[in-house]
Every structure is written in structure tokens, then in C-alpha cells.
UniProtKB/Swiss-Prot annotation:
Protein name: Photosystem I reaction center subunit XI
Family in the record: Belongs to the PsaL family.
Organism for this UniProt entry: Cyanothece sp. (strain PCC 7425 / ATCC 29141)
Keyword annotations from UniProtKB, A to Z: Membrane, Photosynthesis, Photosystem I, Thylakoid, Transmembrane, Transmembrane helix
Locations listed in the record: Cellular thylakoid membrane
GO BP term, pick one: photosynthesis
Annotated TM spans: 53-73, 84-104, 125-145
Amino acid sequence: MADARDMELIKPYNGDPFTGHLSTPISDSDFTRTFIGNLPAYRKGLSPILRGLEIGMAHGYFLIGPWVKLGPLRDSDVANLGGLISGIALILIATACLAAYGIVSFQKEEAAANPLNTAEGWSQFTAGFFVGATGGAFVAFTLLEKFDVVDGIMTGLFN
């Protein structure tokens, strides 16, 4: 008869209960590993500036929406502009925090296998994040401002 412990779905990672990681059908699946491996934080072959640019574009794009719909100017005609200004202010704060982290963490110049683990690499990542996030915020603002045109294109009004 099969041992009931062999049929558990949640078990210690690699059979070692002291690693502090639970192996579940979700966290250990090939789909999850592939998905996480393709995120810009873990993708191989990206330079720090491109990694920061891609992460920044995503963050800048999704930061505008909450400010437009939930911010103090949500019921006014300038809600989109208020969302853009607030989003860029938050991007500036995040960029300052990333820069401060890099200054504190990478004081010694040591050769690292990952270029992101050096002061120069982290500085490039921070610059890429700022440019990407600002660009993403402006793209979101433009789409919100021209929503009628974009909606017309998507519904086939302009053929």
C-alpha cells in the first residue's frame, strides 16, 4: 500500500524541511518557472539600463490610473493631468530611493558576476527606471487624454 506521505501536494522543497520554502504544484510548475524567468528582473542577457527601462515602463504606465480615478482631482476636467503630475512625483521619489539604495549598498568596487550588483550597474538601472517610468506615465496620460480617438480606432469607427 502507498504511503500517505508520498501523496501530499505540499511538501518540503527538495525534501528538506529546513530550507524554508514549500514546494506546491503552483510554485514548482514549469509554467511558473518560465513566467518568472521571463520577467525583466530575472531574464538573462539584459543590461542593467534595459532592465531598468522595461521595469520602469510598466511601473510608470500603471501608476497613473489610481491617481486619475482615486486622486483629489478625480471629479475635475484636469484629472488626467493631476494623475500625470502625481505619478511623476512618485516616480521621482522612487528614483531617489533607488539611487540612495545604490549609494549605500555598492560602496566597494568589486567585480561581480551580475553587473546589477555593482555601483555602475545599479546607477544604469536607476537611470533606465526613471526614463522608462516617465515615458510610461506620458504614454498612459496620452491614451487617457485621447480616449475617444483610441476607442474609435478599436471599435472600427475610423476605417
